[in-house]
């Protein structure tokens, strides 16, 4: 392992220490805004002392992930704090402004998944060090507020969409600071997985988010749950709002409740969501709250306008539904959709929650005059019972084998070789899109033999 040292980076509002290991700079937990409970993100004040950003950063308070059975306990041991609005940056050390000036590099900013209830941008499985080293890009992992702290509208207490506002604040930080890491603020590709991909879809329509004045120039949507986004969430949001008011108006006041107490309220709301078809995402961006104070028809129109000017790369895993069969079976029978007799539960979830609507968005991007890219990930260790399940693509893009080696979905004699060999090619593909390269084809099936 290469020796690790500290390096000073000057940002707009002050200086930080980042770590330098080999040819990669990594800054962890760089604050982009201040979080006040149930309030929009606030600007940070300039600072004079050098802030150390070389240690693991905190997560938004959260319960264990629903997908630990696939991914393993990826958040175990991480500190949690409501003061969690930070980014983590990985960049080639040879391109820093303090060294010989070079051409600014494309930026890939990443919004993690986790159903808007778990995850964080500084997790080791989402490290962009290997991606930055392999592709000559600057990678930024974004941490934002989750669950009841980030997305649940509570009348008289909390607006919705605070996590979406956090993401926009992080993108503004990138615009203002990424050149300090050798990144080009005019070449930002916003990538997101699962809930992160759904976030990008919402940012297409957000006030100041998408369109010609966008905070990002290209978009990668990985396994976006757009089928769940299309479900009628209105009644569920109202029911959870009422339940939250009851809980916070009693023995757990919103202003004084501890984070753990708020998570217990969130757990009750998640249980209440089982009466609704959209229970996969009880907490998610909601129309009627900033920056989405628009009608459904205006939302759709804004997405279509964004597709005209933001190049799109969209795709999914072949066996998405494997991860969610138990969740689907937990929907109350009165709210559970009927499954065609020709389809299995896994196939139905894969198509209706993820794949069909992603296919439609790709077609819409083509109709808008674009040349969108598409991928299907169809690779998994031969012995894995999870097949090419939801989140499988992440092991080939971020983190590397050392971070993912304990994930149950990668168990098998060929797991390490697949992650390393196929991952090298997948990283090239993601970087090629971020660079705007012409590969002579735009549709990709990623299997064990995949080469760019």
Model region roles, listed by residue range:
Residues 1-158, 408-426, 434-441:
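Non-catalytic accessory segments of hydrolases
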Residues 113, 162-166, 194-198:
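Active-site loop->helix "elbow" adjoining a glycine-rich segment at hydrolase catalytic centers
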Residues 142-144, 151, 224, 377, ...:
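Active-site loop/turn elements of alpha/beta-hydrolase fold enzymes
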Residues 158-179:
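Alpha/beta-hydrolase active-site loop
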Residues 176, 205, 213, 218, ...:
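Substrate-access "cap/lid" subdomains that shape
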Residues 181-194:
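Alpha/beta-hydrolase fold nucleophile elbow
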Residues 197-210:
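Short glycine-enriched nucleophile-adjacent loop
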Residues 322, 326, 363, 367-452:
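Mobile gating loops/cap/lid regions near enzyme active sites that modulate substrate access
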């Amino acid at each position: 392992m290469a020796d690790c040292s500290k390096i000073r980076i000057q940002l707009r509002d002050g200086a930080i220490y980042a770590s330098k290991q080999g040819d990669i700079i990594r800054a962890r937990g760089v604050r982009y805004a201040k979080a006040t409970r149930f309030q929009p993100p606030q600007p940070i004040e300039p600072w004079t002392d050098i802030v150390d950003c070389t240690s693991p950063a905190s997560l938004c308070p959260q319960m264990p992930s629903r997908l630990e059975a696939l991914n393993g306990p990826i958040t175990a041991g991480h500190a949690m704090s409501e003061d969690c609005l930070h980014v983590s940056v990985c960049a080639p050390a040879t391109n820093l402004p303090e060294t010989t000036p070079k051409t600014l590099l494309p930026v890939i900013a990443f919004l993690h998944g986790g159903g808007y209830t778990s995850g964080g941008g500084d997790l080791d499985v989402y490290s962009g060090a290997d991606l930055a080293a392999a592709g000559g890009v600057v990678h930024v992992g974004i941490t934002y507020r989750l669950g009841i702290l980030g997305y649940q509208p509570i009348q008289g207490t909390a607006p919705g969409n605070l996590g979406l506002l956090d993401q926009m604040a992080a993108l503004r930080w990138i615009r203002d600071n990424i050149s300090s890491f050798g990144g080009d603020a005019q070449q930002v590709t916003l990538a997101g997985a699962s809930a992160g991909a759904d976030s990008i879809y919402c940012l297409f329509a957000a006030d100041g988010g998408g369109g010609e004045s966008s905070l990002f120039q290209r978009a990668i949507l990985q396994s976006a749950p757009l089928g769940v986004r299309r479900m009628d969430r209105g009644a569920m949001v109202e029911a959870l709002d009422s339940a939250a008011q009851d809980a916070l108006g009693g023995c757990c006041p919103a202003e004084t409740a501890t984070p753990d107490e708020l998570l217990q309220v969130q757990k009750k709301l998640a249980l209440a969501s089982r009466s609704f078809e959209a229970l996969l995402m009880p907490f998610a961006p909601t129309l009627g709250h900033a920056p989405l104070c628009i009608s459904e028809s205006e939302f759709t129109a804004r997405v279509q306008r964004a597709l005209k000017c933001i190049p799109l790369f969209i795709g999914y895993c072949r066996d998405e539904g494997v991860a969610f069969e138990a969740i689907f079976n937990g929907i109350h029978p009165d709210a559970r959709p009927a499954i065609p007799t020709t389809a299995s539960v896994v196939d139905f979830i894969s198509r209706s929650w993820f794949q069909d609507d992603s296919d439609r968005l790709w077609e819409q991007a083509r109709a808008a005059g674009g040349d969108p890219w598409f991928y299907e990930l169809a690779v998994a260790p031969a012995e894995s019972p999870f097949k090419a399940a939801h989140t499988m693509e992440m092991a080939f893009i971020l983190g590397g084998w050392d971070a993912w080696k304990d994930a149950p979905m990668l168990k098998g004699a060929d797991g390490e070789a697949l992650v390393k060999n196929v991952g090298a090619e997948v990283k090239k593909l993601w970087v090629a899109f971020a660079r705007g390269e012409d590969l002579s084809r735009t549709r990709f099936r990623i299997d064990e033999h995949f080469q760019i």
